[in-house]
Amino acid sequence: MDRRDFLSLLAASTALPLVSRRARASGTALPKVVVVGAGVVGASCAWHLAARGCEVTVLEAHGVAAQASGHSFAWLNAGDGLQPMSYHLLRSLALGEHRRIAAHMPVPVLWNGSLEWRDAAHGAETLPEEVLRMRERGTEMHLLDVAGAAAIQPGLQVAPGTPLAWGAHDGALNGPATTRLLLEQAQSLGARLRMPVRVRDIASRSGGGVRITTDGDSIDADRVILAAGTGTTALAERAGFALPQKTKAGVIALTAPMPPVLRTVLYGPDVHMLQRGDGRVVLGEKDGPPAGPAHAERLASEPNAFPDPAIAAQHGERLLARASRYVPALAGARIEEVGIGWRPMPADGLPAIGFAPGSSAVYTAVMHSGMTLSALVGRLAAIEIADGTPVQLLADFRPGRFAAA
């Protein structure tokens, strides 16, 4: 996608209504939709579809925001400037969509920007180029020195001479609270939430639509959305198509509420941190656990918790110690919760959004970052499902691309 296409799609997308009544006004019957997955992406799809008048049922195997959405750093940003233009556009528009949703409900989001810095092992040499590319694409981003960064985050301790990227319009979302809020809003519009329910099979019906077999019963629907994060790969296989992923684990720790310390999202090479509106500081790391057979065996089932509270505490204190080197005011924080987040990510790193190959009933919505993209993806999925209108913004992200791999 070149810059002209980018600007054309940007103009067209901003003209789209938040909730379309086209299908209802034309007299066309609205589809009955099952959403598999009660994370932030599934919750956004459910709310947007329910707002259009669709009959919506959400099936969840574990709990609301129990998987990736409950263990996510939840930094809202437009990407890194090295990604395809179409993906950059999707993320950029999603930031605006979060603001639009916040006009309809009290979404717990803070728009305090972000500061990112790196070391040699994490791509420090490419950061200036990425900032330049982001600016060329229309994203407000600046390269700062240490003094400039300290004016934004007082007390920040980074090595002299370190360049930092300032993303002025980035934000931070409370993922679990946002997911619950979206589902509550969907339920107020008639959506149903069923859990714990495991999907055992997904099959096409001879007369059209799809039958979802669970561990307790079967549900007939016109459409099903697979939005189960890392679990979407197995669901896709049951539905008869391939959706490979390269999932990655990361430790997330939360402190007890504390007075305001962080004025922005801080994303360092070995730790990242943000402070929610409730005072809790979220700590995370980009690198996963060390490689080795012991870790591989323990992580094979993708657990969200550590096997021993003492091990969890060690990981939390490790992240806190790293964060405190950059922001000494965090040294007195108390770790309250530590978990493992599994990032859903299709094998080529790009979202997989749209109908499965050869199907008009099975729709996928799996991606990284779901926190950033969820607001827009829910809206666009509702347009495609309720209105039956393909959205050009999603053309590069169809799941059918894996069929030819």
Model region roles, listed by residue range:
Residues 33-57:
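N-terminal Rossmann-like FAD-binding beta1-loop-alpha1 element of flavoenzymes
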Residues 222-263:
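Central helical "cap/lid" subdomain
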Residues 2-25:
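N-terminal export signals
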Residues 73-152, 270-272, 280, 303, ...:
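Dinucleotide-binding Rossmann-like beta1-alpha1 core, especially the glycine-rich loop
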Residues 325-405:
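C-terminal catalytic lobe of FAD-dependent flavoproteins
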